[in-house]
Amino acid sequence: MAAPAPRLISVFSSPQELGASLAQLVVQQAACCLADAGARFTLGLSGGSLVSMLARELPAAAAPAGPASLARWTLGFCDERLVPFEHAESTYGLYRTHLLSKLPIFDSQVITINPALPVEEAAEDYAKKLRQAFQGDSIPVFDLLILGVGPDGHTCSLFPDHPLLQEREKIVAPISDSPKPPPQRVTLTLPVLNAARTVIYVATGEGKAAILKRILEDKEENPLPAALVQPSAGKLCWFLDEAAARLLTVPFEKHSTL
């Protein structure tokens, strides 16, 4: 069994400082990936509070790179709710409105689900699109995945004690019984999450403190979904604000612009 990915925990004094640093890291990762002619940068996005955080910080951070650089980005989604893109619960819809409208990124650069399909077919269709975008990879290898973590320890649409945690064959799985609405979703599976070159978890607020202590410090017999993300050949980073990190006793790096 491969050794767990090296883990870096960074703690910021506020969500605003965290967001600014996250945006800079995305841009730096992109620049490293695009240093070779003909290369591209592949980014997997999650929803929730990450949408507003990236919408606030990423356009300005990415502006110096220019449209030619951003034209070499490919975006996908770590999970998605099976609702129309115009629906308030659509992760892609929210990013399209609040972030992508501010960036010179074309629809052809964004890999989305087809929300008109039944959930099983939507998962198969999204998997097919990913395989087309990541030709040559038996499992899609994203340069960077940005993940959130729920107060129950879920990440993407992988929930505690759910059978999808055992999925090893599919790269995308349907879920029809999500404990968090809406119930029908499409999610990347653990093999894809663990194939990424870099994974960044983002968590803010005191409401995440207890679950983060379990994920980052406890050795549980039945690990929470977020604790199962251990990139086999990549980096694992945690970006937390002080409120979310308040119960941690493990070493972490403290960041502040004050």
UniProtKB/Swiss-Prot annotation:
In-chain residues carrying the UniProt-annotated modification N6-acetyllysine: 180
Gene3D superfamilies in alphabetical order: 3.40.50.1360
Keywords of this entry: Acetylation, Cytoplasm, Hydrolase, Phosphoprotein
Pathway: Carbohydrate degradation; pentose phosphate pathway; D-ribulose 5-phosphate from D-glucose 6-phosphate (oxidative stage): step 2/3
Protein's GO biological process: carbohydrate metabolic process; pentose-phosphate shunt, oxidative branch
Location in or out of the cell: Cytoplasm
GO molecular function: 6-phosphogluconolactonase activity
Any one Gene Ontology cellular component term annotated for this protein: cytosol
Positions carrying N-acetylalanine: 2
Modified sites of kind Phosphoserine: 49
E.C. numbers: 3.1.1.31
Phosphoprotein is among the record's keywords: yes
Catalysis performed (reactions): 6-phospho-D-glucono-1,5-lactone + H2O = 6-phospho-D-gluconate + H(+)
PANTHER family named among the record's database cross-references: 6-PHOSPHOGLUCONOLACTONASE
Family that this chain belongs to: Belongs to the glucosamine/galactosamine-6-phosphate isomerase family. 6-phosphogluconolactonase subfamily.
UniProt function note: Hydrolysis of 6-phosphogluconolactone to 6-phosphogluconate.
Stated name of the protein: 6-phosphogluconolactonase
Taxonomic lineage: Eukaryota, Metazoa, Chordata, Craniata, Vertebrata
Protein encoded by which gene: PGLS
